[in-house]
Amino acid sequence: GAEQFFSRAFDFGYSKSPDETLKFWGHQKILSDVDWVIRKFRPDVIITRFPTTGEGGHGHHTASAILAGEAFDAAADPTKFPEQLKQGVTVWQAKRLLWNTFNFGSTNTQRDDQFKIDCGGYNPILGKSYGEIAAASRSQHKSQGFGVAAQRGSVIEYLKTIKGTAPANDLFDDVDVSWQRAGNKNLANTINKVIEKFDVL
């Protein structure tokens, strides 16, 4: 499932530029919020919805992408927001930061050389495709009346690497996703034995 985090930034209406947005929010204050989340949650991959270059069409959107890039670096730098390190978090370097490009209206930022993933998989446990789950989620957007039709089948998303190493074959290239990462070899062995002996019948 997903976990949602909040900063002290809030939607104050249409903003013409990221500079206006960051001035209103307090650039360093909000950057520290994003930095804290990265250090606490420790993501391996960070994906932004909007670019830093303005195609998102809204100051808040562009500012969020700028903050993501700055926090990607700051979270790994012990000289940035050092007071956080006394509150139970440590520095953290995510493997990569990507921008999920889009083709919306008259703006197409997708390119053939960008990394592609198919988000249209089906979850047999939930009995729904990820497109259906996403549609249900968007229908809960309270302030702007969003909503999209549920869909099944292939949904290709394009991702442009902004910082860190670019993925070649998988979004989690060079990331340890095994149980060994939990730091408990016995746990990994136990899980492997359970999987080996599991009989659905």
What do the PLM-derived regions correspond to, one by one?
Residues G1-F81, N103:
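Active-site beta-strand->loop->alpha-helix modules in alpha/beta enzyme cores, enriched
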